[in-house]
Amino acid sequence: RMYNGAYSARDHGVSLAFVTSNEIYWQVRFERDNEGRARRVIVGYKDFKPDPVRNRALRTILWRDLGRPEQELSGVQLPTNGFLDWGGLPFVPIHTHTWPFKGTGLRSGVAVPGELVGYEIDSFDPTYPAPNAVWRVLIGASPFVNFEGDSGYTHNMSIYRARSGALVWATGSMDWSWTLAPGGSSDGAHNNVRPSLQRLTENVLGRMLAGGRR
C-alpha cells in the first residue's frame, strides 16, 4: 500500500524528491508480534532464510522481481552490488544545459570533487522500463568501482516530469545530504558542502514547490 500510495501521489500531481538512494528495494510485510498485536513486526527474509509465504503479494522479494522495478517510480534503482565499502565519490554532472543546473556553474563531464556519491549508489538500468514521463533526463553520471573491486558501474541522477505534471527527482546517492550541510564525511573531519550542489537542490525543490511551472 505504501508503494501504491507513492505511485498514486505522483499520478495525482504530487512531486516526489528522493534525496538519498536505494529507497525502494524489497517488498516487506507486516505481521503480528509475540503478543498477537496486528501489524507490529516488519518482516523481510532477504537472503538469510527462505520466506515460507508463497503468495507473491505478501512474499518478501525485490520489487523488480514482481514486475514493478523501482526506477519506474524514482527514475533510478540500486544495481546488484552497487555500493562502496566506505566513503564516497566525486559527482559528475551531465546535461548541464537543463534548468536544474541554472546558476550552478557546473559543466557536463567535469567532476565536482569530494565524497558526494555513496555509499549505496543508484543507476538507471536500460533492461528495465523507464518511468512513464513526458520529459526525462539523467543529470548525473559518475563512474565507480564497487566494494568488490568491480568496475563498469555508473551512478545516475534522474529527473522527470510525469504525465500528471509532477516532478520526480532522485539523487541516487545515500550521501547527498553531505553536500548540503556541514558534518557529513566518512571520517567526520572533512567538509563536503558544495554551493553548486546546494543550488542544484534549491532549483529542483523550488520548482516543485512552485507546482513545477517556474
Which sequence ranges carry the predicted segments?
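Short alpha-beta junction capping motif
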Residues: 1-26, 191
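Extracellular ligand-binding/catalytic regions of CAZymes and related secreted enzymes
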Residues: 25-46, 84-88, 92-214
